[in-house]
Regions:
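Generic cytosolic/nucleocytoplasmic N-terminal low-complexity/intrinsically disordered segments
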Residues: 4, 17, 64, 82, ...
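Charged phosphate-binding loop/patch that engages nucleotide di/tri-phosphates or the phosphate backbone
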Residues: 100-133
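Unchanged
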Residues: 21-109
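Functional cleft and adjacent loop/helix regions within the main domain
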Residues: 17, 23, 132
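N-terminal strand-loop-strand
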Residues: 1-16
Length: 133
């Protein structure tokens, strides 16, 4: 499980890579780009896991965000946090470690769902097989 640690404003703590869809991008392209930008990891999408929403206030206005989550396989164990965005650390963790490190409950739930999908694929000997797109 790939996580990164942020120290910007109130978001101190470990989180999953995510970001905003840029014009002309699909959700899949955004997910891959954000993983690369935020952690410098190269990955490929295995399966769509689900969608979550969260909200916060900015200048007394509520902002609601939707995040589409994907189970991915990294090419290796390299990661480097994106310092320009105030990320101070990144790394790969076992499920139980990642679960306890994550700050936000909705990300813990998505992590559980992704882990269940991973276990299903692993039990069928389908994890780690490079699929053609």
């Amino acid at each position: 499980m790939l996580l990164y640690k942020s120290y910007k404003n109130r978001y101190d703590g470990w989180v999953l890579p995510k970001g905003t869809v840029e014009k002309g991008e699909t959700h899949e392209q955004t997910a891959l780009r954000e993983v690369k930008e935020e952690t410098d990891a190269n990955a490929r999408i295995i399966k769509y896991v689900g969608k979550s929403e969260y909200s916060f206030y900015s200048f007394h206005e509520q902002i609601v965000k939707s995040v589409h989550w994907y189970l991915m396989e990294a090419e290796g164990y390299h990661s480097k946090p994106q310092k320009e965005e105030f990320f101070v650390d990144s790394g790969y963790y076992k499920f139980h470690e990642a679960y306890h490190l994550l700050k936000f409950p909705n990300e813990k739930e998505i992590l559980k769902e992704a882990y269940e999908e991973y276990k299903k694929l692993k039990s069928k000997n389908q994890w780690g097989i490079r699929q053609r797109r």
